[in-house]
């Protein structure tokens, strides 16, 4: 634990820094 794999925020584009993350409605990226 302790790590946050999806650290990006997103508006119109997807999430690129960590594979397997997607943009959610709160404009943050989460693991699928």
Swiss-Prot record:
Signal peptide start and end residues: none
A GO BP annotation: defense response
Cross-link (Cyclopeptide (Gly-Asn)): 1-32
Disulfide bonds: 6-21, 10-23, 15-29
UniProt keywords, alphabetically: Disulfide bond, Knottin, Plant defense
Pfam families from the UniProt entry: Cyclotide
Purpose: Probably participates in a plant defense mechanism.
Domain free text: The presence of a 'disulfide through disulfide knot' structurally defines this protein as a knottin.
Name of the protein described by the UniProt record: Cyclotide glopa B
């Amino acid at each position: 634990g302790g790590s946050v794999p999806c650290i990006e925020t997103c508006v119109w584009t997807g999430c690129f820094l960590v594979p397997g993350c997607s943009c959610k409605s709160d404009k943050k990226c989460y693991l699928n």
